[in-house]
């Protein structure tokens, strides 16, 4: 496959030039205005940040993208799907409240917010995975698949399971419904934390497989043989008593995530933007963010999400670790087994290259790229 073009700009701002203006110029240079958006729904997929985490992208960046879409006659909306785990984004109401508390309002973003998989994370579309090796179909939030055009706006940072979180993770994991996230993270089966179960029977009423019964203490029990892994019981429980068994090895998680991302992007115009800043060692899904492991690098954009992630990863690999960080402290530990890889030296149990390998294998894009500075 021919090398893709990735556009890049740094964070330096001479007097009179703002970061939002630099992002706008980057998107235009990368070709966002070549997409026919007239009268079309445009899903802008981003992470609104868990409450307590301050590393997420500011809403001002989202407004730049939304305004560009509206200038071209598009109807943009910001979107994400509910989380698989307890937290401030596990259902649509709390998710919207979280987004608003973190500054995401129509006034600040230039468009509305839709939680793509509905109130309880069950409003999904089963989408074929092109050339899927591990997943033949992907369970994706309905509003994302209803959009005519898909744009990812990603915070590129480290990640404790996948090495880094960039465009492919934002798309693959982020667009998965609750059942989709379960399929990627696990064998697809939930479990019950008995001390939190109230015996309300709401989960059993939601289960379409008759897989939930109750023991002598009126605590839910899931029959793993009957369970189809739809995740509806997790959304049904208001007490966080049901959770997903995250038993997939990191490399399998990476590869499934890449296939999910390919399903989201297949068959329609897409555009991808990543900001490599506040490079925390872990996911923005945490209720906190540790000190950045690397200095801020810049903003990147491309029509090819695989090339985009590779370019961002390469920039991070070539950056000098910050001493007062998880990465810096690991490298300073006597006897540390140095991997000469900023992602693996921050989180040693990851296999980040598998994501890019699988994404390229299923035809989502190419790891070969040409970098053009704007």
Feature map (PLM): residue ranges:
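Extended, low-polarity segments enriched in aliphatic/aromatic residues
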Residues: 2-53, 57-61, 71-80, 85-374
